[in-house]
């Protein structure tokens, strides 16, 4: 039986980014706490820990029995969607001349350890990979692809990350394409256009073809029409 007050206190403390309060709540017992309690926006304590880029609170919450890392809020976002939308593109940060793992990188690696589903789609059909591409977050893209994120998933507008890759001002386009080619050598053939590798998806106006392409892992390459 869960203690509603303790569960709510954990949620509010995580939202307030209050390390001491979270530790105090969890120091004696976690069996009475429901870590999956959601607020009015559908967010859990884990959502707030990740939104606040707080690796300490994230780790404490993940150690609670029966915590669900894949809960979606009212927008369909999992914690991974929020992490993908962070602007940091650094694996490491410098403090007093020493290198440390950045908070978002530490949290990402921890979430992978707890088996988070990298291909969950939000209410618009976007995965974490869609948002990572939009944010030019290269290290995040690399980590997602290394943990079985699919580049072939279409959002509700009919676009995969490959279309976004070619329409966004992506600073790491060549590197991302190289990663995709190494992981999906049979599905992706690279073409040279104006001395740069360009890869793109079919347009959303061709309603039936994107789904056929998704089913058969087919990609179209060349000059964007």
From Swiss-Prot:
ANK repeats lie at residues 6-35, 41-71, 75-120, 124-153. SUPFAM superfamilies: Ankyrin repeat. PROSITE patterns: ANK_REP_REGION, ANK_REPEAT. SMART domains: ANK. PANTHER family: ANKYRIN REPEAT AND PROTEIN KINASE DOMAIN-CONTAINING PROTEIN, ANKYRIN REPEAT-CONTAINING PROTEIN-RELATED. Keywords: ANK repeat, Repeat. This is Putative ankyrin repeat protein RBE_1025. Disulfide bonds: none annotated.
């Amino acid at each position: 039986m869960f203690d509603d007050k303790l569960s709510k206190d954990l949620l509010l403390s995580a939202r307030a980014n209050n390390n001491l309060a979270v530790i105090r709540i969890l120091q004696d017992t976690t069996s009475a706490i429901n870590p999956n309690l959601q607020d009015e926006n559908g967010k859990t304590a884990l959502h707030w820990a990740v939104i606040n880029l707080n690796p300490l609170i994230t780790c404490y919450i993940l150690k609670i029995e029966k915590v669900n890392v894949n809960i979606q809020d009212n927008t369909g976002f999992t914690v991974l969607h929020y992490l993908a939308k962070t602007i940091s593109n650094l694996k490491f940060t410098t403090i007093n001349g020493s290198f440390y793992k950045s908070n978002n990188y530490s949290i990402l690696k921890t979430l992978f350890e707890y088996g988070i589903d990298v291909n969950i789609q939000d209410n618009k059909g976007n995965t974490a990979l869609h948002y990572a591409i939009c944010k030019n977050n290269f290290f995040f893209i690399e980590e997602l692809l290394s943990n079985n994120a699919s580049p072939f998933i279409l959002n509700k507008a009919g676009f995969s990350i490959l279309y976004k890759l070619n329409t966004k001002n992506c600073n790491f386009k060549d590197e991302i394409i190289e990663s995709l080619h190494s992981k999906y050598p049979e599905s992706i053939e690279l073409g040279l256009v104006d001395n740069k590798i360009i890869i793109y998806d079919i347009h959303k106006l061709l309603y039936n073809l994107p789904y056929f392409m998704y089913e058969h892992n087919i990609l179209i390459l060349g000059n964007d029409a």
